Swiss-Prot record:
Pfam families: ATP-synt_ab, ATP-synt_ab_N, ATP-synt_VA_C. It is a peripheral membrane protein. Coiled coil: none annotated. NCBIfam families: atpD. Keywords: ATP synthesis, ATP-binding, Cell inner membrane, Cell membrane, CF(1), Hydrogen ion transport, Ion transport, Membrane, Nucleotide-binding, Translocase, Transport. GO terms for molecular function: ATP binding; ATP hydrolysis activity; proton-transporting ATP synthase activity, rotational mechanism. This is ATP synthase subunit beta. It comes from Parvibaculum lavamentivorans (strain DS-1 / DSM 13023 / NCIMB 13966). Its EC number is 7.1.2.2. SUPFAM superfamilies: C-terminal domain of alpha and beta subunits of F1 ATP synthase, N-terminal domain of alpha and beta subunits of F1 ATP synthase, P-loop containing nucleoside triphosphate hydrolases.
Length: 478
């Protein structure tokens, strides 16, 4: 540990300049000082001249004074890792924020790590079944892959992530890490309590701080926190996940929201004196994103499957922030406002969402053929919509009318009630097996259910549920 002591020279918002007479700390080193009785961590970002470093604060800087002493810790920010973090909420510097005492840990690990080398990485493709029909059928997730959930404000990214945590964490039984990056504190609080209620985590306050048996570690740096915390909290979460992976676990790593990581970087970038690039983002956008994403990978020891919510500013997928993240993903799930306006949830766009593993070699011929058939029908319906809008349904040929009828049923059958939304909708959630999903959509494409009304396919699980709903609707109408 270096014991070099410096003094604060100036404070500009989240950026603090510190002067050292000798032993200048290295870039990315953590410096410590106190502010109002609390420990404040500063991370070195730049060297200015011979004896000054420019740092980014991990907490608020109100109350700091010039001339105040700052100590160099001699290494990067370290956080507790190991099974003691499960069931607990920690912040960017690894301190507990759930008021349940100190975090028990096996070791502390630096948040800046090298990405695994090519030799250590594993490349086999395997499907991760989520129980969500539209995802499993049209844009399946790879075990150990990176998945992006793209969507504008309020189309259901966080609900979809919560459903995935619920479905996969329960079915998969492994450990999960949830990094809340610059999102609403209320949602983080809800998630924490929902996890305790659903049995994924144990309540530390009821067991004298003990969370043995918990499955998910939570790492939060929320909207109200300074940009330094939001720019680093994803790395803190990833460090916790990497430790489990290196112990041979298959880990699920959820990030909500990766855009806020970029946004925080752009906030401090200008304060650090960098010239902004396109749309005002930081010039190091691709480098920052690459440094995070390249560490999220599957090695020969274990795997990290990551699901990342990606906010799309003004619903524009060509914005540099979402566009940069596209390059790193194995599967993209695009949420569309037009679909959510129809009341179809999850509002996943079946034509825009993609997956690298949707090929017969990985998912099997029947699954592949059914998915392509569904997309073909939906694509034809999309191309007919202009004609329908101008001339009406009557001008279509009989064949096209049939395509439209099937497409509308498929659209509704892609909806599904969620477990985490039960409290709002009153409809019990369903988890649909991939075999049932393929069977249902194959029958729809082949016209086996042309006689059933559209309404029967809305918000049901399997095709048997749809048939039962049709019978119920017929009885009610009679």
């Amino acid at each position: 540990m270096s014991n070099a002591v410096g003094k604060i020279a100036q404070v500009i918002g989240a950026v603090v300049d510190v002067t050292f007479t000798d032993n200048l700390p290295a870039i990315l080193n953590a410096l410590e000082t106190t502010n109002g009785g609390n420990r404040l961590v500063l991370e070195v970002a730049q060297h200015l001249g011979e004896n000054t470093v420019r740092t980014i604060a991990m907490d608020t800087t109100e109350g700091l004074t010039r001339g105040q002493e700052v100590r160099d810790t001699g290494n990067a920010i370290t956080v507790p890792v190991g099974e003691g973090t499960l069931g607990r909420i920690i912040n960017v510097i690894g301190e507990p924020v759930d008021e349940a005492g100190p975090v028990k840990h096996e070791a502390r690990r630096e948040i800046h790590q090298e990405a695994p080398s090519f030799v250590e990485q594993s490349t086999e493709a395997q499907m991760l079944v989520t129980g969500i029909k539209v995802v499993d059928l049209l844009a399946p997730y790879a075990r150990g892959g990176k998945i992006g959930l793209f969507g504008g404000a309020g189309v259901g990214k966080t609900v979809l992530i919560q459903e995935l945590i619920n479905n996969i964490a329960k079915a998969h039984g492994g450990y999960s890490v949830f990094a809340g990056v610059g999102e609403r504190t209320r949602e983080g609080n809800d998630l924490y309590h929902e996890m305790i209620e659903s049995g994924v985590n144990k309540d530390p306050n009821e067991n004298n701080g003990d969370t043995t048996g918990s499955k998910c570690a939570l790492v939060f740096g929320q909207m109200n926190e300074p940009p330094g915390a939001r720019a680093r909290v994803a790395l803190t979460g990833l460090t916790v996940a990497e430790h489990f992976r290196d112990k041979g676990q298959d880990v699920l790593f959820f990030v909500d929201n990766i855009f806020r990581f970029t946004q925080a970087g752009s906030e401090v970038s200008a304060l650090l004196g960098r010239i902004p690039s396109a749309v005002g983002y930081q010039p190091t956008l691709s480098t920052d994103m690459g440094a995070l994403q390249e560490r999220i990978t599957t090695t020969t020891k274990g795997s990290i499957t990551s699901v990342q919510a990606i906010y799309v500013p003004a619903d524009d997928l060509t914005d540099p922030a979402p566009a940069t993240s596209f390059a790193h993903l194995d599967a993209t799930t695009v949420l569309n406002r037009a679909i959510s306006e129809k009341g179809i949830y999850p509002a996943v766009d079946p034509l825009d969402s993609t997956s690298r593993i949707l090929e017969p070699r990985v998912v099997g011929q029947e699954h592949y053929d059914t998915a392509r058939q569904v997309q073909e029908i939906l694509q034809r319906y999309k191309s007919l919509q202009d004609i329908i809008a101008i001339l009406g349904m009557d001008e279509l040929s009989e064949e096209d009318k049939l395509v439209v009828a099937r497409a509308r049923k498929i659209e509704r059958f892609l909806s599904q009630p969620f477990f985490v939304a039960e409290v709002f909708t009153g409809t019990p959630g369903v988890l649909v097996d991939i075999k049932d999903t393929i069977k249902g959509f194959k029958g729809l494409c082949n016209g086996d259910y042309d006689h059933l009304p559209e309404a029967a396919f809305y918000m049901v699980g399997t095709i048997e549920d749809a048939v039962a709903k049709a019978e119920r609707l017929a009885k009610e109408a009679a």
